[in-house]
Design a protein with these regions (language model features):
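Helix-to-beta-strand junctions that scaffold the AdoMet/dcAdoMet cofactor pocket
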Residues: 42, 114-115, 128-130
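Short glycine-centered segments of the SAM/dcSAM-binding site in methyltransferase folds
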Residues: 46, 131-133
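Short glycine-/acidic-enriched loop or helix-start segments at secondary-structure transitions
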Residues: 58-60, 81, 116-117, 125, ...
């Protein structure tokens, strides 16, 4: 993905990005998540991408490196997602798969849109094989971007994302019910899944590219919260990993 085109960056901001983040891939949250995901993936694994979308926004190169990569999304365009072996239109809260179908389940910027987290987490546990893992990238509820998002309506989010080069149809309402360490741990533990790790990361200020001043302030914030673990609770993204115990029985579908 062309970062400048994707975010509609001003030339002055582009120059600042090159100055402060010369290795842009290393400072990209999706790239950081994919590196973490790859630590758990084997060539024989069956993977499920929750909220896979069109494959144009959050990219990875897992197809062809695993046994099978399936994606699910309510958007019918998932059927043409080039990153997948198969794209299926379905509600991620009611997955159309048999119990114990996947070795790895993952999601990229999806949890913040889930208004019934208990149903989703139960479904993840149901379709995971014993010993399988679930990895998720989602915004941290304590970050300034998320706090601002909660105070503004969805049309404002669409307008801001349009300025960043993101189509309006790819911006969805956010409810942030799984966007803290505690919320994630509570929901997944209740579903019988074990916490492996929950890390917080702060990356380049992609939401502050509308002016040079805002971008520089964002760089300062990034440097500050990355300077000490004491400020890690205020970093922008959560990367969470949970595992289904080897001895786990099938987790029943949550009643609707």
């Amino acid at each position: 993905m062309n970062v400048n085109a994707a975010y509609g960056w001003l030339p002055t901001v582009r120059a600042l990005r090159k100055r402060f983040y010369p290795d842009v891939v290393q400072r990209d949250p999706v790239a950081a998540f994919v590196r973490r995901l790859e630590q758990f993936v084997k060539p024989t694994d069956d993977l499920l991408d929750l909220g896979a979308g069109t494959g144009q926004l959050n990219t990875h190169a897992l197809k062809g490196r695993v046994h099978r990569l399936v994606g699910v999304d309510v958007d019918p365009r998932v059927g043409t997602n080039p990153l997948l072996d198969a794209g299926i239109r379905a509600d991620i809260g009611m997955l159309p798969f048999r119990d114990c179908s996947f070795d790895v389940v993952f999601s990229i910027y999806v949890l913040e849109h889930v208004d019934r987290p208990g149903e989703l987490v139960a479904e993840i546990g149901r379709v995971l094989r014993p010993g399988g893992v679930c990895l998720m990238l989602t915004p941290n509820i304590l970050h300034y971007v998320t706090l601002c998002s909660r105070l503004t309506p969805t049309p404002v989010h669409k307008w801001i994302n349009a300025k960043r080069g993101r189509p309006a149809e790819d911006t969805f309402p956010a409810v942030y019910r799984l966007n803290s360490r505690r919320a994630l741990s509570d929901q997944f533990n209740d579903a019988g899944l074990e916490r492996v790790s929950i890390d917080l990361i702060e990356v380049q200020p992609n939401y502050l590219t509308f002016s040079s001043l805002s971008y520089v302030l964002g760089v300062g914030y990034e440097r500050l919260v990355n300077a000490t673990e004491l400020l890690s609770p205020f970093r922008v993204n959560l990367i969470a990993v949970f595992r289904k115990p080897e001895t786990a029985s099938t987790i029943a579908r949550t009643p609707r």
